[in-house]
Amino acid sequence: MNIEKYTERSRGFIQSAQSLAVREGHQQFSTLHVLKVLLDDNEGLAAGLIDRAGGNSRAILKATEDALNKVPKVSGGGAGQIYLAPELARTFDAAEKAGEKAGDSFVTVERLLLGLTLEKTSEAGTILSKGGVTPQNLNAAIEALRKGRTADSATAENAYDALKKYARDLTQAARDGKLDPVIGRDEEIRRTIQVLSRRTKNNPVLIGEPGVGKTAIAEGLALRIVNGDVPESLKDKKLLSLDLGALIAGAKYRGEFEERLKAVLQEVTGSEGTFILFIDEMHTLIGAGKGDGAMDASNLLKPALARGELHCIGATTLDEYQKHVEKDAALARRFQPIFVSEPSVEDTISILRGLKDKYEQHHGVRITDSALVASATLSNRYITDRFLPDKAIDLMDEAAARLKMQVDSKPEELDSMDREIIRLKIEQEALKKESDAGSKSRLQTLEKELVELEEKSASLTARWSAEKNKLSDAQKLKAELDGLRVELANAQRRGEFQKAGELAYGRIPELERQLADIEAKENSGEMMEEAVTANHIAQVVSRWTGVPVDKMLEGEKDKLLKMEDSLGKRVVGQAEAVHAVATAVRRSRAGLQDPNRPMGSFMFLGPTGVGKTELTKALAEYLFNDETAMVRLDMSEYMEKHSVSRLIGAPPGYVGYDEGGALTEAVRRRPYQVVLFDEIEKAHPDVFNVLLQVLDDGRLTDGQGRTVDFRNTLIIMTSNLGSEFLVNQPEGEDTSAVREQVMGMVRGHFRPEFLNRVDEIILFHRLQRSEMGRIVEIQFARLQKLLTDRKIVLTLDGAARDWLAAKGWDPAYGARPLKRVIQRYLQDPLAEMILAGDVKDGDNVAISSEGNVLTFNGKAPQTAEIAQFEAPASKRKLN
């Protein structure tokens, strides 16, 4: 016996058999050990051959194990020393001779099994013979497995049944009802069939964005082949999906991968056109399996593709096709591209309606039609970095999974009741130990309460169980119905019309009636939701994108008509600006503005401290329920020419290329927010060139070539240009003349093509003395909020409010001096009083003014004399 003449798998089995003999304490290494490890093999090569040869592999394995249990065991000093049984040596000789006779260079696993049958005097040979496995039958099974191939390498077994190992039969999956229905895509499927029907280069490649349904087209073709809805040239074909991962996995030695792929190609080409190979992610062929001097997978495919022997359908994305396949012109010319475009929202709704039954059956909940429409429309509007129908299907799937999880969990009402029962039982046990009258009285009351709660809990639990059972029964019926429909389709294909009639007019209608009865039973006051609605879809969108659900589902008219009132609570004295912003947003939301532009783009002009940035924060909070839903860029940081790359990311080859830009990354991660360009006039002119595309098309390409969507952002730019005209404007004077002066300065600084793209240029006027009181109240409310946790309540009377307003008013500096006044005269004394213990948690503090100081509960603060606050330039006008 020359072990080098055995294949790797044969050697592995011989070593495993030897280890088994040692482990069991047997003195002889016999044919029984070899047969046992051959039949224990996970891949089942030997077991499969025995079954093909007319034997029963399970019965033979049982007989082998029984025989091994009867073999004497050796323990003590002689244990571990084993000897080769003479019949096993003869078995190896017989296997080698059988291999040589068949033209093999190596002894394979099946020859080893054949050797066991040829050595009839051995125990294993006897078991196989009794099991009905003869050398003649086994030889015939081996020939059928090998299909004329000889074992020329140490990994020869990898080539057996290569398609079963490395490919998935899509046509069989279609027959078994394991494929989702394919709705639409008729044009692409027809074009694929057309290319497959060509004489040469009959290999289509489906090219499209991720998630548009390329793989679904291949599955649709498999369904059509099964249903006979294809030309004669494609009838009875088998569509096989190649698993490149399985081909590469475990290929340790050089040439092993090529051998596996070659075996697949030989089976496909040897079938004389019966098999069509589908290669998903086709670009992975390029370089797959390539090592030192080895050929990659694509080079092995080229000859068969060019001759038309190999029918192949590829699928890859546009980017990967351009990056990998187009560079290899010899491979690209052998494929005929078929471009798969993204379906429209209407087509997506049709696709979802076709898939609905499968998802209802899987999750065990109902999916309403409004949920399907919401999935398509909301995903199209709000999830911009992915493609239909994939993103819409994901929405529907996740919403159904979320509802199913809620259905399986205990309802909140029942859960809180059960927790209350546990709490009362603990109290009951504690009261039983007390002997006073009060405790006994409380115990009686508690026991009555406990009985009532337990009865109510039992009733609710019964209701909940009934509702769960109803859903479970419906799910089982749907699964059974699905199986019967697959059975009906197969019966019709096979021409078994009696069976088809029984199914179509008997069992299926009966199950449909039962299902309708279950779904018609409406429980009064259901404890849990049983159907996925548009609201559930909106909640999932909210979790994915950060858009508040209530804002999306609230009526647009009601929401937007309240806008001025809401913004006016935070921004004082700028009614014109608030109105201009509200009308622009209303115009955008009403669909009267180009949907491919941002929601709105505004330029706020005015002096410092009048509420430009505050209005931006108020907008973010109102539109997105979150003041932080805003990316703020201080344009004083973008004064140099090279700083433009910080906005959109460094170009390839520069440091920071992988990091992305400050603007593009912020919007890409959170597409729904306010974008604030503060002090826009300080930016370098090249920054405005970048913004032109954003303002006009609502999109921007970053340094890595990704398109970032700005259509759902609100763009605001603030500037102090012309503020001196606004500050010096006398109260009550017409603003049109001042506006012209300000706009003259703006036009002198910004280029016309930039200004022309801004929706509104809004003037903020200086704050009037009469408006300061409201600002004091807003600032005071924020201070009160800081003390909420301490339960300290502040009250501010009119005199104190007027005192603070007078101290903080400055026409040149707006409301910012007021913030400093409140900090100095209100917050600082309060902080010292809290630290000194004069004001404790839960106290009420009344703030008033006496003379030139504020009093706290009638007392002036016990601190060093507070210096008079001189508001800078209160009387001075800016030149």
From Swiss-Prot:
Region named Repeat 1: 6-71
Disulfide-bonded cysteine pairs: these are none
Primary gene name: clpB
Q: Which GO terms describe its cellular component?
A: cytoplasm
Q: From the UniProt entry, list the residue stretches annotated as the region C-terminal.
A: 767-879
According to the record, the residues making up region (Repeat 2) are: 84-148
Alphabetized GO MF terms = ATP binding; ATP hydrolysis activity
* Species assigned in the record: Bradyrhizobium diazoefficiens (strain JCM 10833 / BCRC 13528 / IAM 13628 / NBRC 14792 / USDA 110)
Q: Where does ATP 2 bind?
A: 606-613
The identity of this protein, by name, is: Chaperone protein ClpB
> CDD domains this protein is in?
AAA, RecA-like_ClpB_Hsp104-like
**Is Nucleotide-binding among the key words of this record?**
yes
Positions binding ATP 1 in this chain are 208-215
The yes or no answer to whether the keyword Coiled coil is present is yes
Q: Which GO terms describe its biological process?
A: cellular response to heat; protein refolding
Output the PROSITE patterns linked to this UniProt entry.
CLP_R, CLPAB_1, CLPAB_2
- SMART domains of this UniProt entry? AAA, ClpB_D2-small
Keywords tagged on the record = ATP-binding, Chaperone, Coiled coil, Cytoplasm, Nucleotide-binding, Repeat, Stress response
What is said about its interaction partners and assembly? Homohexamer. The oligomerization is ATP-dependent.
Ranges in coiled-coil conformation: 393-525
